[in-house]
Amino acid sequence: MKRTKLLPLLLSALLLLSASGCRPAEAPSQSGGASSSVSSSTSSSGIPAPNDEVLPIDLAVLSGPTGVGAAYLMEYYAPEHVPADSPISVSSVVVTENSEATALLSNGEADIAAVATNVASNFYHKTDGSIQMLAVNTMGVLYILEKGDSIQSMADLRGKTIYASGKGNTPEYALNYVLTQNGIDPASDVTIEWKSEQAECLSALMAEENTIAMLPQPFVTTAQTKSENIRVALDLTEEWDEIQAESDAPSTLVTGVVVGRTEFVAEHPEAVSAFLEHYRASVEYVNANVDEAAQLVGQYEIVAAEVAQKALPECNIVFIEGVEMKDSLSGYLSVLFEQNPKSVGGALPDDAFYYSR
């Protein structure tokens, strides 16, 4: 009789142990210290119990490096997984073009978005301040690749043809800046073949020997996976930093940022603060747990999992907010403005552009 009563208890204990072994790796705590659990309050059916105090946030992220840092947040703070103690849930969508993200912000279908840096500045001016800059999430990820061994410095690009994508955005302005600062006129000293997609640049690079292309991660990793003869000739972030080292107020190359609708930020400051803490923890998790993060990144089609596995350590994923964010962004946008005022929307953003909690 006693054995009959003990059997259900033993089975229950085994089930609990089994369930605990299947939980995902935990993200770093939002304070950067001990880990925080991603488990949620559940009913007897296993479905997360409803929490009337949870504020839903709609998030749009750009595929590629700009969206990578949000992968953990997108999975474990989704409405069906949100922890019981979280004041927010996050419903996310991945887009392939900046214009898709800004359209979602415009019509209120997205509250927060991860987009290219200069796109954020342009959109701010175009919409009379309808968004605010919340954080920097991606630093420089641009590289000059070569199927050969002739490019050892920026000077070696003179007279060459460079395949590139991203005309009118960060890639064009970054390339033009480092070329110009090295005494190379982008309009006459080199030939830049602008392609509509990174995949076209990759195809051109693969086609014949001594081809040169500018590519961002994770396409750099993809290229080197396809051919052992393709090498990284120049790191544009390093070239940028070398130029800026002599400046009175050095800037750095900033590829991606997180922005929020100004109205939403003003109405829900506590929710925005919670989101930023979760985002910080997500970035820490992605950088510290490459294998697990690569699977999440692939699951959400931000970057293919097998590529993300190798590329994540090179994607320069960060979380920078507040004064440090403003300093890095204002310096970077100033460099773009000096090249072409239209690149940042015709004027540098005012202080209201930069959110600080």
Where are these regions (language model features)?
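Sec-dependent N-terminal signal peptides of Gram-positive bacterial secreted proteins and lipoproteins
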Residues: 3-25
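Short, glycine-/small- and polar/acidic-enriched structural segments
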Residues: 32-33, 46-194, 211, 217, ...
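Conserved C-terminal helix/tail region of periplasmic/extracytoplasmic solute-binding proteins
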Residues: 330-357
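Short, surface-exposed acidic
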Residues: 186-190, 301-313, 343-350
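Pocket-lining segment of extracytoplasmic ligand-binding domains
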Residues: 118-119, 200-296
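Bacterial lipoprotein signal-peptidase II cleavage site
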Residues: 21-34, 38
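Secondary-structure end/capping motifs
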Residues: 265-339
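Short, solvent-exposed loop/beta-turn-alpha elements that line the ligand-binding surface or hinge
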Residues: 78-88, 238-251, 317-326
